[in-house]
Amino acid sequence: MNRHEIDALPLEGDVSFRERTPEPGRTALLLIDLQKGEYNEKKIKAEPQHAYFWDRLAKTVIPNGQKLLTACRAAGVEVLFTNVECYTLDGRDRSLDYKVSGIFFPKGSKDAEVIDELKPLPNEIFIPKMSSSVFMSTNIEYVLRNLGIEYLMIMGVVTDQCVESAVRDACDLGFLVTLIEDACGTMTQERHDATLRAIKGYCRQRKVEQVIEEIGRWRKEAAE
């Protein structure tokens, strides 16, 4: 375990340990790639073949994300955001994969900003990344350790790429991960569901209302 040890260590083979409920003061919410360059009216019109994805974002991911942000902020949960954004204006610092794929959001560009519906508050943390997994190209692990985080809740897009990569890496680094299933999305429901099955050994999987209920119990217990 990391130096911020979780109190009750698991017995060998006790898979129920990853189902532990996140705890106040040791939990963060991470939002992945909900950025203007990937979700905007121009792109929606230009890519009608991704109609399912646009609908999933508009009707499920964004409204559920708003509910979750409200609950987390009210409970004092640390909120972090990560989007694809270069450290340079010309993109020379991008990963090879992003160069080959043509993924390019320059430093300080509007396209690299979080969408307005879920935008960070002034004192919340935004970490630009240049890889699928935020843990590969940033100092997010260092930041989470400094914040005393042991439980990491994850939402965002796309489920079977950057979200999945973050879940796997966070688990391998010793965080207890909760994937917010109905605050994530990808190009098809089939791809989304297949990913949930593939990574169930790396995380708890919960819906937004379940997590909000858990957070509500924290506040109730704190008030008693």
What are the residue ranges of the model-derived segments?
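Asp-based phosphoryl-transfer active-site loop
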Residues: 30-32
